[in-house]
Amino acid sequence: MYLKAYYALKPWIPRNVQLMARRAWIRSKMGQYGAVWPIDDGAGAPPADWPGWPEKKRFALVLTHDVEDLRGLLRVPRLMEMEERLEFRSSYNFVPEKYKVSPDLRKTLESRGFEVGVHGLNHDGKYFNSREIFADRARRINRYLEEWNAVGFRMPAMHHRLDWFHDLNIEYDASTFDTDPFEPCPDGVGRIFPFIVSNGGNGKRYVELPYTLPQDFLVFILLRENHLETWKRKMEWVVGKGGMVLLIAHPDYMNFGETSMKIEEYPAEYYRTFLEYVRDTYRGEYWNALPREISAYIRTIDIRN
């Protein structure tokens, strides 16, 4: 009910008012959730019989980007070049019915070692209003997955119903998190390792990849932090557990200096500095894998839900 009301009213509420309201709500809840955010100690246990990461790496590093709008789409080349210079690779998730994603851009990303995924169809929040609505949208999403030769999916706003996602022709989903009580759907999966979601009815299964670092939008836009301590602290904990460090960073919110800073932006320098920190602090210790590579590995060792 809350989500339906939110999406019905959202177009009529000025964006700065939306941000002020969310910031006030988060401030009011911060003390309540201090024991489970940004670190939930109960999420750190590895799966039974966990064999570790390939090549005996200490942890996995998975960089992902959700491209929410045209502004973010136009910044993808700058972000890709930044990651290339620092010798990182990532995935880019696009919203196919919100803006046009050119075949040339997808081809460029893939040819340079990046991955392309599908990020829903739009951002109207109606995917789970009924089983019929989701089934219809799943058919359309599957067409984009096939057209793009993509194997991964992330739902807008991290909404999720893992049992319904079996309608999608995917190898992995990335619509959950270990802990994030400030999300519209705050139910975390309570783990920092990927896992397999099986459908006993028809044998279909996919790998679930929860994000394990707080999203950039929360840290830099809503909390308005101008430092990297939250990311560093959480990463140190995940690394200590040998888990998967999975980050979502949005090019929409990164300002590369081409325009004046807007209310929903932070300096792209923050992300670059974080990548340099990871490279220099954990050199040789991480497996910088694409989501599809994580999925393929988990399937080989069959880590079940």
Feature map (PLM): residue ranges:
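Active-site-adjacent pocket scaffolds in enzyme catalytic domains
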Residues: R27-Y33, N142-G243
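Short, well-ordered coil/turn segments that N-cap beta-strands
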Residues: K57-L61, L86-S90, S111-V116, E146-V151, ...
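Membrane-proximal basic amphipathic "stem/tether" segments
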Residues: M1-W37
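Generic structural signal for well-ordered alpha-helices
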Residues: P47-A48, V76, M80, P103-K107, ...
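Conserved, mostly hydrophobic/aromatic
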Residues: L9, D66, V116-H119, F153, ...
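C-terminal domain-boundary segment and adjacent tail
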Residues: G44-P47, E55, L228-N305
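Active-site beta->alpha N-cap acidic-glycine motif
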Residues: K29-E115, A157, R161, L223, ...
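Acidic-and-aromatic substrate-binding clefts and catalytic sites of carbohydrate-active enzymes
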Residues: E68-L74, N93-D104, D124-A135, G152-D163, ...
